[in-house]
Design a protein with these regions (language model features):
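Conserved, well-structured core segments that form the ligand-binding/active-site neighborhood
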Residues: 30-48, 184-189, 231-241
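Short, Lys/Arg-enriched N-terminal segments with co-localized hydrophobic residues
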Residues: 17-28
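Generic secondary-structure signature for well-ordered alpha-helical cores
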Residues: 47-58, 71-78, 97-103, 120, ...
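Conserved mixed alpha/beta catalytic, RNA-binding, or beta-rich assembly cores of soluble enzyme
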Residues: 108-180, 187-188, 194-196, 204
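C-terminal functional extensions of proteins
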Residues: 198-241
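Electropositive, gly/pro-rich neighborhoods at or near active sites that engage anionic ligands
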Residues: 28-103
Length: 241
């Protein structure tokens, strides 16, 4: 400490130097940032993804789904963990553009919120989530099972083409598989992207082994945002074509 300098003054001096150094670094960071128009951000992001992602044997439709998932999560693991059943993307796209309408069933309101409503409306589609329905909650409590199980049973009563987009609950995929095995339901398409550690990997593999057209994020990664991203990637192949 300099002669005659008070401790409080020393603290102020050090703080001032720290702030100057920090502000200098902040200014450097700001100067290196790219100025991008809002409407160009997604295209710029996709260009970065294309430049950095590994090579693969995807069809153009599959590649669009992979890129959308990477874009959503900023995670290049989706270049290797996405499973597509034979002709899955083409089948889903044809269903969506058929004009018959379709219903997307999600297992979370987050996934429901993430599905692009403008694209959905353009394709005469709807999106449903039964998880928060009072009767679903009451029945699940009475039976001692998860709401995801009961919500899948309620969804089985829907008419018309149905796409299941499951991004959170492995029990939803397991119940779907059980009902499929019993002939109680035959989904038109399944998107399986639950995230987590308990029964997640196993539930996804059940769907991969089924005869229902599907897109599955194998392994532990996934989430409601990924389920919605897959839905949007499929719809955009019609609405943005």
């Amino acid at each position: 400490m300099k002669p005659g300098m008070h401790v409080d003054n020393l603290h102020v001096e050090r703080t001032s130097r720290f702030e100057q150094e920090r502000n200098g670094k902040d200014n450097i960071m700001i100067e290196t940032m790219q100025w991008v128009r809002p409407e160009e951000i997604e295209a710029r992001s996709m260009a970065i993804i294309e430049a950095e992602m590994p090579e693969g044997n995807w069809t153009p439709g599959e590649l669009a789904v992979v890129k959308r998932c990477i874009h959503t999560a900023a995670d290049f693991d989706y270049a290797s963990n996405l499973y597509f059943s034979d002709g899955a993307v083409e089948l889903a796209v044809n269903l969506m553009k058929s004009g018959r309408g379709f219903t997307i069933v999600t297992d979370t309101n987050m996934a429901l919120a993430g599905v692009n409503k403008a694209a959905l409306k353009q394709l005469n589609g709807t999106v449903r989530c039964f998880m928060a329905d009072p009767d679903v909650a009451a029945e699940a409590k009475e039976r001692g099972v998860t709401r995801a199980i009961v919500s899948m049973e309620h969804a089985a009563k829907l008419t018309g083409p149905v796409i299941f987009a499951i991004g959170n609950a492995p029990t939803a995929l397991i119940r779907l598989y059980e009902m499929m095995q019993k002939g109680e339901i035959q989904p038109d398409f399944i998107i399986g992207t639950p995230v987590g550690f308990v029964n997640v990997v196993e539930s996804k593999e059940l769907i991969c082994q089924s005869d229902v057209p599907c897109i599955v994020a194998r392994g532990r990664k996934g989430g409601s945002n990924i389920a919605a991203a897959v839905c949007n990637a499929l719809m955009y192949q019609v609405t943005r074509a």
